[in-house]
């Protein structure tokens, strides 16, 4: 018995040492930060699914108001959380080449070759190739299709709201963004069966699992073990979708030159030349396997539909709570649409100045893309400090913390679109507003996201008002199992026909 007790004691001691061995890293370097917990580091609440990770980072941001750089532990791995906007500007923009990678690599067969997670060279080539899909000219050509999707969406709202005006607004607007992404990006017209399949798939994509924590504990392990952040069912679905869509198109271009047209062009080339930083640099071409192609379809779908749906959910919630803002917005929508014979055009959207402010303020208060992550490609001393981050270490920027900091946004809990008047914007630090990140690696589809959201909002508010629901009257309790921050149980509003 004594031997067993001694063995257990020794084993416990070894485990404690192993899971705390790095915890003096920042203390030795005189970098302030929260006290880590064995095994969990500073992420205990998110690992135990008590809070979303984004809210854990916000809490750390709030805890150290006088620090420029905060030393944190993502599990047992030393990382930093940046608070100083000038330093953030250096990392994201001025010294971008030192932080070009996100540091989240996983199996290329498990969707890891997508443009969001791709490393520097692969990312550059993919970004350059897909940028033409999101030019102003391309988006203008998509507006009539977005408007048609919006009209069908209103018809579906008419049906459900007649018998049940109280609706989960997130579930509702998801149907619009799913259908719109499918139509504008993939050239697909979704039927009810496909919508149900995508709704089921949502749970697999946006329910958090422990792959990310494993990669924090052992950086690079997912890539080494050919593992993925997403379940096999997700990659299998997008592999099949890619195959079926390309087979349907059979090399015939669409009238609007959508993403599938670009993918068909890439397929014919077989490889994609990687960008060279220097003229004489020897780089290998990226082989365009079916896995690489389906990874792009996955990320454009994932990023395009859920971020917009979540943003609109919060926007309609705030309008229901603030009827004066809703009245002003409805008046603008009615006036602008009347000048354009009810048609939503590029010129029409350009005149929707108050809608733009409401949208921007929603993303200020609820930055659904959560936090920005970058990996150091070299040892780097943060400007204005003597703090060095080592090559391979991770940087976190708490967008939620910055954009709800009273230092930059007085009374941050107040929903105030006037924060985005031109005179207020010009006096604000450029890195005080980062819903789409900043610099060369900002969100490629941010204009698409804004336009599709504005089309949906205009369609809804031209026919309906939103009013508060008793189901969503209390303080939010964010769902710790959801990848993007969304209240547990969703958000409900009452849809009232105008």
From Swiss-Prot:
It comes from the Eukaryota. The keyword Endoplasmic reticulum applies. Induction: By xanthotoxin, a secondary metabolite abundant in the host plants of this specialized herbivore. Heme binds at residue 443. Changing residue 24 to D: In 6B1-2 and 6B1-3. Its cofactor is heme. It is an enzyme of class 1 (oxidoreductase). SUPFAM superfamilies: Cytochrome P450. It comes from Papilio polyxenes (Black swallowtail butterfly). Midgut microsome. The keyword Iron applies. One of its GO terms (molecular function) is heme binding. It is a peripheral membrane protein. This is Cytochrome P450 6B1. Its EC number is 1.14.14.1. It is found in: Endoplasmic reticulum membrane; Microsome membrane. Enables the insect to feed on furanocoumarin-producing plants and evolved as an adaptation for detoxification of xanthotoxin and other furanocoumarins. Pfam families: p450. Keywords: Endoplasmic reticulum, Heme, Iron, Membrane, Metal-binding, Microsome, Monooxygenase, Oxidoreductase. Its main location: endoplasmic reticulum. It catalyses: an organic molecule + reduced [NADPH--hemoprotein reductase] + O2 = an alcohol + oxidized [NADPH--hemoprotein reductase] + H2O + H(+). The gene is CYP6B1. PROSITE patterns: CYTOCHROME_P450 (PS00086). GO terms for cellular component: endoplasmic reticulum membrane. Belongs to the cytochrome P450 family.
């Amino acid at each position: 018995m004594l031997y067993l007790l001694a063995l257990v004691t020794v084993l416990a001691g070894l485990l404690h040492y192993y899971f705390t061995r790095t915890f003096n890293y920042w203390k030795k370097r005189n970098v302030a930060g929260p006290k880590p917990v064995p095994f969990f580091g500073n992420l205990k609440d998110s690992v135990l699914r008590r809070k979303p990770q984004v809210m854990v980072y916000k809490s750390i941001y709030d805890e150290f108001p006088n620090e420029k750089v905060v030393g944190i532990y993502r599990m047992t791995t030393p990382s930093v959380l940046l608070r100083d906007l000038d330093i953030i500007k250096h990392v994201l923009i001025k010294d971008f080449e030192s932080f070009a990678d996100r540091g989240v690599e996983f199996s290329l067969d498990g969707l890891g070759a997508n443009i969001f997670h791709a490393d520097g060279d692969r990312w550059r080539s993919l970004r350059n190739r897909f940028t033409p899909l999101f030019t102003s000219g391309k988006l203008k050509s998509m507006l009539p299709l977005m408007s048609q999707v919006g009209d069908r969406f209103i018809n579906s709202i008419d049906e459900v709201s007649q018998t049940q005006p109280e609706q989960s607004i997130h579930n509702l607007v998801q149907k619009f963004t799913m259908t719109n992404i499918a139509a504008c990006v993939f050239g697909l017209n979704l039927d009810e069966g496909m919508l149900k399949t995508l709704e089921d798939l949502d749970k697999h994509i946006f329910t958090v699992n422990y792959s990310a924590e494993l990669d924090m504990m052992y950086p690079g392990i997912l890539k080494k073990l050919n593992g993925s952040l997403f379940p096999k069912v997700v990659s299998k679905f997008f592999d099949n979708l890619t195959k079926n869509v390309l087979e349907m198109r059979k090399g015939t271009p669409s009238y609007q030159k959508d993403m599938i047209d670009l993918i068909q062009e890439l397929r014919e080339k077989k490889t994609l030349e990687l960008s060279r930083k220097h003229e004489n640099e020897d780089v290998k071409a990226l082989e365009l396997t079916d896995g690489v192609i389906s990874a792009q379809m996955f990320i454009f779908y994932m990023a395009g539909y859920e971020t917009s749906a979540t943003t609109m959910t919060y926007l309609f919630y705030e309008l229901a709570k603030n009827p004066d803002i809703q009245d002003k917005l409805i008046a603008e929508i009615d006036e602008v649409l009347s000048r354009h014979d009810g048609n939503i055009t590029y010129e029409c959207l350009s005149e929707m100045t108050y809608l733009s402010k409401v949208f921007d303020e929603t993303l200020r208060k609820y930055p659904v893309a959560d936090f920005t992550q970058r990996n150091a490609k070299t040892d780097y001393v943060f400007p204005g400090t003597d703090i060095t981050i080592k090559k391979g270490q991770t940087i976190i920027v708490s967008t939620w913390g910055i954009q709800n900091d009273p230092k930059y946004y007085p009374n941050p809990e107040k929903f105030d679109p006037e924060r985005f008047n031109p005179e207020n914007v010009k006096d604000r630090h450029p890195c005080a507003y980062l819903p789409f990140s900043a610099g060369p690696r900002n969100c490629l589809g941010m204009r698409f996201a804004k336009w599709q959201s504005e089309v949906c909002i205009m369609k809804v508010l031209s026919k309906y008002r939103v009013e508060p629901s008793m189901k969503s009257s209390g303080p939010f309790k964010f769902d710790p199992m959801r990848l993007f921050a969304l209240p547990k149980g969703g958000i409900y509003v009452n849809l009232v026909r105008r």
